[in-house]
């Protein structure tokens, strides 16, 4: 069996059959030469949640200088920082201690994942809140295709989603799009799947769906934004309302979209036929709610609320409680 050669960067590639992949990953992605990465006690302690060992090690300057070092550890394959490891395991006390000792909260691993993102993915609310309070970017990193908001919306963790929103997460954000309309090497979107509002509906997570809308999520996302829906795959939903109906979501999803000002004319009547109903049977009550809403003009009260919220913009909705208005009107504007 031939030995592995060298890669384009001059580093040795994987060796013969059955190569030690962990060692190869360490060689490729660790922050320091291999001879300096043999001592993984700091990373191992973060993995098992051994706070006392972390305290002891970080009393020494040699370990304090390595607090942001990416390295493999006892049970890990991809080189990560101690904070990233502790966040993955959900050791909130270790996460807090490492941050207070100088760990950088927004460093990314080789996949572009931040400590906050992996805390959310693994469902650790305490670690999520500690990282957010320490200033972690609630939107994650542009180097990764997903976001904390998107994942929380997909799995129905409304408690984590509330925390992300409270710390200013963008409820429409997705890292597939850039400010440029046609950025070089960008991938054009051909579906709604990158939209947090859409994914919460696709998985029938009503509470997350409501939270996103209350926080200012665009009910017509991808229809009046930077995406050309004409390039969507034939038969795929062109707007969130269309997707809600096709996925067989209950009537409450439709009612919320109507209440938050969705453009009902974006759904084509011909798209509601049996051949366009998708994998699930369309909810007859939801379809009836949609048809009734489309046939009856919205009330002036409803239109005013939508107009005021749009004028404020999603980034200023949190200021509504400070407006010089009666409490009932504030609650009305916030859909409380």
From Swiss-Prot:
Which pathway does the database say it acts in?
Answer: Protein modification; protein ubiquitination
Q: Which cysteines are joined by disulfide bonds?
A: none
Gene Ontology terms: biological process: intracellular signal transduction; male genitalia development; protein ubiquitination
This protein's GO CC annotations:
ubiquitin ligase complex
* Tissue note: Highest expression in testis, spleen, bone marrow and salivary gland.
ANK repeat ranges are 37-69, 78-107, 111-140, 144-173, 192-221, 236-266
Stored Pfam families:
Ank, Ank_2, Ank_3, SOCS_box
Q: What Gene Ontology molecular function terms does this protein carry?
A: ubiquitin protein ligase activity
Keywords in UniProt for this one?
A: ANK repeat, Developmental protein, Repeat, Ubl conjugation pathway
UniProt KW Repeat keyword: yes
Q: Which InterPro entries match?
A: Ankyrin_rpt, Ankyrin_rpt-contain_sf, ASB1_SOCS, SOCS_box, SOCS_box-like_dom_sf
Disrupted-gene phenotype:
Decreased spermatogenesis with less complete filling of seminiferous tubules but fertility does not appear to be affected. Deletion mutant mice exhibit less severe colitis associated with less decreased body weight and longer colon length compared with control littermates after being orally fed with dextran sodium sulfate.
Q: Which residues form the SOCS box domain?
A: 287-336
On subunit structure and binding partners, the annotation says:
Interacts with CUL5 and RNF7.
User: Can you tell me which family this protein belongs to?
Assistant: Belongs to the ankyrin SOCS box (ASB) family.
Free-text note on domains in this protein's UniProt record: The SOCS box domain mediates the interaction with the Elongin BC complex, an adapter module in different E3 ubiquitin-protein ligase complexes.
State what this protein does. Answer: Probable substrate-recognition component of a SCF-like ECS (Elongin-Cullin-SOCS-box protein) E3 ligase complex which mediates the ubiquitination and subsequent proteasomal degradation of target proteins. Mediates Notch-induced ubiquitination and degradation of TCF3/E2A and JAK2. May play a role in testis development.
Instruction: Please state what the protein is called.
Output: Ankyrin repeat and SOCS box protein 1
């Amino acid at each position: 069996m031939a030995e592995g050669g060298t890669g384009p960067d001059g580093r040795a590639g994987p060796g013969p059959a059955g190569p030690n992949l962990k060692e190869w990953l360490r060689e490729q992605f660790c922050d320091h030469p291999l001879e300096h990465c043999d001592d993984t006690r700091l990373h191992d302690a973060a993995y098992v949640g051994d706070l006392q060992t972390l305290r002891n090690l970080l009393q020494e300057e040699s370990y304090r200088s390595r607090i942001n070092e990416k390295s493999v550890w006892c049970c890990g394959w991809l080189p990560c920082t101690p904070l990233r490891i502790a966040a993955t395991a959900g050791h909130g006390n270790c996460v807090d201690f490492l941050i207070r000792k100088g760990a950088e909260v927004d460093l990314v691993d080789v996949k572009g994942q931040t400590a906050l993102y992996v805390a959310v993915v693994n469902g650790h609310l305490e670690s999520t809140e500690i990282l957010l309070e320490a200033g972690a970017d609630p939107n994650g990193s542009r180097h990764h295709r997903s976001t904390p908001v998107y994942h929380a919306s997909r799995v129905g963790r409304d408690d984590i989603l509330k925390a992300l929103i409270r710390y200013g997460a963008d409820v429409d954000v997705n890292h597939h799009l850039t400010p440029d309309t046609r950025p070089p090497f960008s991938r054009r979107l051909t579906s709604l799947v990158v939209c947090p509002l859409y994914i919460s509906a696709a998985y029938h997570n009503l509470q997350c769906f409501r939270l996103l809308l209350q926080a200012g999520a665009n009910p017509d996302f991808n229809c009046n934004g930077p995406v050309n829906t004409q390039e969507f795959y034939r038969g795929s939903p062109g707007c969130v309302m269309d997707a809600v109906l096709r996925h067989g979501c209950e009537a409450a999803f439709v009612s919320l979209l109507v209440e938050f000002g969705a453009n009902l004319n974006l759904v084509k009547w011909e798209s509601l036929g049996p051949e366009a109903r998708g994998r699930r049977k369309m909810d007859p009550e939801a379809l009836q709610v949609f048809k009734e809403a489309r046939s009856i003009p919205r009330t002036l009260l409803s239109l005013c609320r939508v107009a005021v919220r749009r004028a404020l913009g999603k980034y200023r909705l949190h200021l509504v409680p400070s407006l010089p208005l009666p409490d009932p009107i504030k609650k009305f504007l916030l859909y409380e």
